[in-house]
């Protein structure tokens, strides 16, 4: 019988500070692996780049956005089968670790609701002024994109300086995702994790989004 090592949440936090993150090969994997890509995807949010069509939708406030109300449901939504793939890198160990990180105050979920139903969202990890985006999901068109807009607005409001998307993915091109090498990423990471920042979760979502319009520097 192969031995399964127990990984503590604190190990995951330490990995993030080094620019390393965990993933499982599949939902049925018993363990996880750690990755440090040579090329990293970083999302700009000072100011954020939001497509014009999505910006118009965002102003209509189509969904109710909440934070950390049902973290397990968000990670389960991210792990659910999708039209383009039936497998996921979120296995039981990943789920357990990130729920533990949530309970410790490091992992956060942004949740989109409509008529009381969770219809999309995302989750990630905050350390200092860095936010490490992990995964997102939608059960209704644009739900995860709206959640991402709210995340970027709050990161900007709270003095964050880095939004790590890990990889450069096609669906994030519309948000101006930037590709940087690991050396440049490490410099940004070191600055970010030593930056004093806060998600300011006591500040209403309406005020956070309104700050985008006041800033008048949102690009599209």
Question: Residue locations for each model-derived region?
Answer:
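N-acyltransferase acceptor-side catalytic subdomain
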Residues: 1-220
